[in-house]
């Protein structure tokens, strides 16, 4: 009878020994499709909280946590009243995408330097790959708050040839 030895580097510094027959019996057991792990070896418990009570990034338990947010509910506008979006927006930031001719966007980005106090960051010109308009580019502008974004849109002159897309981005 063969004996298998391994070391669990993460949780223990001691060796666990399991016989080959015990190992085969445990591996032959077919777990249910909803089982997340199959344990082989000695039973150990670790001080982990269940997924149902583990807090999400915004302090809610996973069962209470927000699902996908529907942008049609008004969260994409500064006057939106989607409370779920605001509650779970710990790592989201207000943004706008400026969409238009690549060269025009490049020139616009350089002109926006003088308004740097009205935004947080601005990306270089980028584009989606795949089927689409190869001459269209996008600039992403991020803000510290919705108020700053509103002030930017009211202050800065954006050319009519550039489309403005307002939204949020998870950082």
From Swiss-Prot:
Keyword set includes Cell division: no
GO CC entries: host cell nucleus
InterPro entries (alphabetical): E2/EBNA1_C_sf, Nucleotide-bd_a/b_plait_sf, Papillomavirus_E2_C
Pfam families registered for this protein in UniProt: PPV_E2_C (PF00511)
Entry's localization field: Host nucleus
SUPFAM superfamilies tied to this protein: Viral DNA-binding domain
One GO-annotated biological process of the protein: regulation of DNA replication
Molecular function per GO: DNA binding; DNA-binding transcription factor activity
UniProt KW keywords: Host nucleus
Protein's job: Plays a role in limiting the replication of viral DNA in keratinocytes. Recruits the host NCoR/SMRT complex to viral replication foci to mediate repression of both viral replication and transcription.
Family, as annotated: Belongs to the papillomaviridae E8^E2C protein family.
Record protein name field: Protein E8^E2C
Species this protein is from: Human papillomavirus type 18
